[in-house]
Amino acid sequence: MGYLHDAFSLKGKTALVTGPGTGIGQGIAKALAGAGADIIGTSHTSSLSETQQLVEQEGRIFTSFTLDMSKPEAIKDSAAELFENRQIDILVNNAGIIHREKAEDFPEENWQHVLNVNLNSLFILTQLAGRHMLKRGHGKIINIASLLSFQGGILVPAYTASKHAVAGLTKSFANEWAASGIQVNAIAPGYISTANTKPIRDDEKRNEDILKRIPAGRWGQADDIGGTAVFLASRASDYVNGHILAVDGGWLSR
C-alpha cells in the first residue's frame, strides 16, 4: 500500500480516549478512527453519541465506558478491568478541566478537583496501560499537555500546575518505558476554539491580543490536533519518546 499507509495506518488498533465528547478529544477520536482505529471513549457527564456517530461514519467501532476522572481512587478497579479485558494499543489522556480565579482567592476544592482530573487520574490510567503494554512489548501513550506546560498563565494556577506536571510525567514514563517499545509523548495545544476557551474568546481585548501573537493569525480548531495524534499513535513515531509537541500556530516561537 506504500509508505504513507504502512507508517500511519492504525488498522487493527484500539484506542482509549478520555473525554472525547467535544472539542479536542472528539477531534482526536475522529482522526484516529479515520486512520483505522476502533475507539473506546470514556466520560462521566457528557454524551458521547455525536462522537460515536463520527467514529462509525469512518467505519470503525465505538464503545463508551464510564469513568469519573474526578475520583482517581474510584476509577482504579473499573479501569483495571477494562485494560484486562481489552487490548488497548493507544491511550490518549485527553480529559481535563479548568477553573479560573485570582490566585489569592482560588478555592482549595477547585485546586484538588483540577489536579484529580488533569493529573492524578492520568497517572493511574497511564500506569495501568503501561503494565499491559510492557507485557506485550509495544504501545502508544499520548498525553494532552498545554502551552501552560511551558508558561504560567493568568487566573489558572491549578491548571498550570497540572499541565507542568503532565509534561514532566510524560518524560518520566518515557525514560522508563522507551526501551520496552512503548512511546510516551504529549501534545501541547495552543489556543484552540473549544468550550474551555470560550471565556477568553468572549473577552474582546484579550482575544485580540492573543490573535496578534499567533503567527498563524487564527485560533486553532479541534481537527488541527487530530493529525498530530495520528502521528504519535502510529508507527511513524516509533523513535519519538518523551516529546512535548506544541500545536500552537507558532505561539511559542514568537
Curated annotation (Swiss-Prot):
EC numbers, comma separated: 1.1.1.127
Highest taxon of the lineage: Bacteria
GO biological process, one term: pectin catabolic process
Induction behaviour: Induced by galacturonate and negatively regulated by the KdgR repressor. Is subject to catabolite repression by glucose involving the ccpA gene.
Pfam families: adh_short_C2
Gene3D superfamilies for the chain: NAD(P)-binding Rossmann-like Domain
Active site: 159
Pathway participation: Glycan metabolism; pectin degradation; 2-dehydro-3-deoxy-D-gluconate from pectin: step 5/5
Binding site for NAD(+): 16-40
Catalyzed reactions per annotation: 2-dehydro-3-deoxy-D-gluconate + NAD(+) = 3-deoxy-D-glycero-2,5-hexodiulosonate + NADH + H(+)
Keyword set, alphabetical order: NAD, Oxidoreductase
GO molecular function: 2-dehydro-3-deoxy-D-gluconate 5-dehydrogenase activity; 2-deoxy-D-gluconate 3-dehydrogenase activity; NAD binding; oxidoreductase activity, acting on the CH-OH group of donors, NAD or NADP as acceptor
Binding site for substrate: 146
Function, as annotated: Catalyzes the reduction of 2,5-diketo-3-deoxygluconate (DKII or 4,6-dihydroxy-2,5-dioxohexanoate) into 2-keto-3-deoxygluconate (KDG or 2-dehydro-3-deoxygluconate) with a concomitant oxidation of NADH.
Protein name stated in the entry: 2-dehydro-3-deoxy-D-gluconate 5-dehydrogenase
Natural source organism: Bacillus subtilis (strain 168)
Recorded name of the encoding gene: kduD
